[in-house]
Each structure stands twice: as C-alpha cells, then as structure tokens.
Amino acid sequence: MKTGRNDPCPCGSGKKYKKCCANRSASSILQEMKEDIHNLIGDRSFGSIEEVQAVLDQYQQQKNEAPVEEFHGLSSEQMHRFLHLPFESPELITFPLELEREPENKAAFLLSMLIKGIGEDGMKLTAKGNLGRKFCQAAHREYYARYPDSFMANLSVRSELNFEPLHAIRLTAQLGGLVRKYKGRLLLTNKCKKALDRNGLRELYPLVLHAYIRKFNWAYRDGFQEIPFIQQSFLFTLYLLRKYGNTWRPATFYSDNYLRAFPMILEEIERKPFEEPKDTLQRCYILRALQKFAGFFGLADLEQVSEGPINREYRVRSTGLLKEVVRWSL
C-alpha cells in the first residue's frame, strides 16, 4: 500500500511523510534500512519466514521506541502521539480540567473581564457583532496597566479589532462554548455559568486553553502565512519549555531546536526577496508559539532584551503554571 503524503512517515520519525522522507531518494532510504538490518541480523540463520519477520518487527519496534536526538529524548513513537494524539495519550501526558489555584496571566485576565462585562444580562454588540467600543477601551486600559507595553498601550482603540488580545479571547470563548451571540447580545452559556459557579477561572481557564489549541486558528493572530504545523506541534513546544525552561534562555534557543526537530517545515515557507525561510520561520514561531500561545496563557515568561517595538528580541523561561496545565509521565 502506497504511503500517503499526510500519513505518518514509515521511517518512524513521527512526522508526516510529505515533511520527512517523501523527497528523499528511494535508494538512500533502502540503503539505510539495509545497513540497519544487516547489523541486526549479522550471520544469524533462520528456520522460517516467521522468525525473520519477528526479528524485523523487533527492529521496527526498537527504532520507534529509541530516543531521537533531535527530539530531545522523545522517541519517534512518542513524537507521533505528541503530534497526532496529544489529548488521547494518557500514558504520556494528561491535561487536568481544573487547576489547583486561580490562574494569573494575560488570557485569564481578559477572560475574567469579558465574563464580568457580559454578566447576567449579556452585553450589547455592535452592528457588526463585535464588543462595544467603551468596553474595549476600558479593557485596553486595564490590561496594559497590568501588563505594561508602552507601544501597544498608546494605540487607539476604536473597535474590538483594535484590541487584538481581547478579540482572540472573545473568539476562543465562543469556540469553546462559553459565550454565544443571541439577538444582538453576547451571553454566557449554561456551560460557562456552571463552571463559573463550581470553580471559577480554575475550571474556565483550561476550557479556553483547550479551545485555543484545538479550535482557534493561531495564524489569524499574526501576519504570517498559515503554517498549521506550528499549532499542531504545540505539545513539543511545551515539552521544550518543560525540559529547558528552568532558566532564562533566548527565544531563538527554542526556535532553533524546533527547526532542528522539524527541518522539512522550511519547505512550507513562502520565499521572500530579502529574508531566508529559516529567518521567517524563526520570527513566526517566536511570535505565534512563544508570545501568543505560551506567553499569553502564562505557560512561559517572556522578557524583552532589545530596545524599541521593532524586531523585538526576548528571553524565555517556563512558569509554574505549565506543570499544572500539563501533567507529564515521561
């Protein structure tokens, strides 16, 4: 049976075939496998085809279970589950549906403001279905008073679309079934009210986080091309933060190791006249995966180490919340 381009690569890397061995010559792949099998079998003799098959099966299993250097200790089998079954692999990771303590981060802060603003009576929306200007302006002031950014704080807010973090949270809350539109108003759903009564943000935060991972399109928040694999591989980003985030490291440390694990992703990058695909990917990954995912949801701290609002450079470390959001069994 022919391997489809979107199927897991038969080499055991955990990547899709089109992003791994699809462009390697058949002869080079076969030669590599031939050498591995020769080293495994050596001068052994076999009494049946079944014995040979058992050895080959053992070879493939060992290959799948062996740690891969580029994956920082993960095997190709584990990486496959990270990429394709992150929420269905309890032997590796679980995602608690309730936190031990009230979360304090940008996403939780905006979610709390949105829920309070909606209240029991709902919130009137604009003719275009967006949050009202006054609410957005007030939320903008409070947000940047708590999380200072001199450049973003001075931007004019005329509509919800001018306050992108709030817009992202509102959309994600809708996708997660926590709020809904009805007759020109935004209302809390019964699901949201029940979770709010039971455990407040300790239960609401995981719901929004999971909706952001599974339903929200991360590329919508920035000006880069889609590159959906960055979102699909969210768990590997968190794994790197868990493994190396106990100390401050440059954001490029994570983007470099991400590219080292998935070099074929460069083939998806649209070429630009004055920028290498590697540099485009680096900027996109740092913004999309580190700033607007891990940083926004409080799973990592990002501290700017450069001057000015253009071409910002950051250092990164993980937070205690990461250990609560993902329980690792590795």
Model-based region annotation:
Residues 82-110, 117, 200-255:
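Leucine-rich, amphipathic alpha-helical/linker segments
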Residues 160-175, 277-297:
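Short amphipathic alpha-helical interaction segments
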Residues 57-64, 129-133, 137, 219, ...:
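Charged, alpha-helix-forming regions
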Residues 1-15:
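Short Cys/His-rich zinc-binding micro-motifs
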Residues 124-157, 245-279:
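Short acidic, hydrophobic short linear motifs in intrinsically disordered regions
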Residues 18-22:
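Cysteine-centered loop/knuckle micro-motif
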Residues 169, 180-219, 301-330:
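Accessory beta->alpha helical hairpin/"wing" motif in late/C-terminal subdomains of nucleic-acid enzymes
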Residues 39-163:
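Short, amphipathic alpha-helical interface elements at domain boundaries
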